[in-house]
Swiss-Prot record:
Species assigned in the record: Buchnera aphidicola subsp. Schizaphis graminum (strain Sg)
Name of the protein in its database record: Phenylalanine--tRNA ligase alpha subunit
Family stated for the protein in its record: Belongs to the class-II aminoacyl-tRNA synthetase family. Phe-tRNA synthetase alpha subunit type 1 subfamily.
Main location: cytoplasm
One GO MF term: tRNA binding
Amino acid sequence: MLILQKLFDSVKIEIKNSHTIDKLDHIRIKYLGKKGIFSNLIKDLKNFSLEERKKYFIIFNEIKKKTINQINKKKIELNKIILDKQIEKEKIDVSLPGRRIKNGVIHPINHTITYIKNFFSKLGFESISGFEIEDEYHNFDALNIPKDHPARNIHDTFWFDENRLLRTQTSSMQIRIMKKEKPPIRLIFPGKVYRNDYDSTHTPMFHQVEGLIVEKNINFSNLKWIIYNFLRNFFHKDIAIRFRPSYFPFTTPSAEVDVVTNNGKLLEVLGCGMVHPSVLKNVNIDSNFYSACAFGIGIERITMLRYGISDLRSFFENDIRFIKQFKHI
């Protein structure tokens, strides 16, 4: 019986001198584990008489229970010390001023798209988003773009398979809308388009806004008036504009629109024209009763001109210093 008491005294000293949870676990396993000291003491009972065994068991269980309580008590104490240290480490002085929340800045591309939406809404245009993954029919066939056209080449277009691709122009939305809606139609389609090109004036992904009007008696003069007014409003000045005859498979006549830059050079900013009768036929609109005009604006290009940005790639490099320049636009 004296052995048990000495054992408990030894346990108490070890528990008292343990300063970590790991050390305490080691003590627990040493004394209370399956192969621990208390388990081994049970084996000695075979040498005791029945009466001695009863007395031994009473003291044994009492000592074992005290040992468990001592270990649990010490564990609570050590956990409290750990928690106190953690709280002290993470202590916050509420009297200190808080960190200032920095305001975000609208990206110049988003700002331009918003400006365009607001301008054309005043002329009765609605804005609709479209699919960025298109099929060959809506992106090419229905827009009167033949099979041998260079734009359909794998070097210029991102193809998923023989039929699906990343749209190369927002014009594909013209087909989808004209199939569903009956004239009169006045819509713009802002969105991303994709072409396999990358340099200071081209990126594989860029933004366009397509405009479409389908009405009776709409003509090229109406289209010119809209474009003149938009560009002069956008650049906030009576900017010199040139309509240059061009070719697009889906419009006839077609034109590219150039503006005079600050250094006196002409720069193309958009394409436009009267929607080709074949395109109207593809969407079951009778070109004898209705005419249609369309225009496509390159968002990055007019934004570069407006704010004097020299490299198109700056829009997509995520340089916060670049974005901050447009804080007050």
